[in-house]
């Protein structure tokens, strides 16, 4: 089970239309992941394309000692969906 900040989840729901727990199932499936090194966050952050709620989602998360912590999630844009389906055509 992934951890998340409930206030951040509410903010994510307002901004992107989905609460953070809605993306959690993507952590259990195939994901395209890269490190987000665009800023100095003080911890290693990842951006992943995964499958949750019947669609491709984009998650920002960090891997902590007690497991993954979700930072944000949203439905993938068209170019991101194409990249995911190229990597995982059986989806």
What are the roles of these predicted feature ranges?
Residues 1-91:
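Ribonuclease/tRNase effector modules and their secretory precursors
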């Amino acid at each position: 089970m992934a951890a998340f900040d409930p206030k951040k989840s509410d903010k994510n729901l307002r901004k992107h239309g989905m609460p953070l727990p809605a993306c959690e199932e993507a952590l259990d499936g195939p994901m395209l992941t890269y490190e987000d090194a665009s800023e100095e966050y003080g911890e290693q952050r990842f951006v992943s394309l995964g499958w949750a709620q019947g669609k491709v989602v984009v998650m920002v998360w960090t891997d902590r000692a007690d497991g993954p912590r979700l930072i944000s999630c949203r439905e993938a844009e068209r170019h991101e969906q194409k990249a995911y389906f190229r990597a995982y055509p059986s989806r």
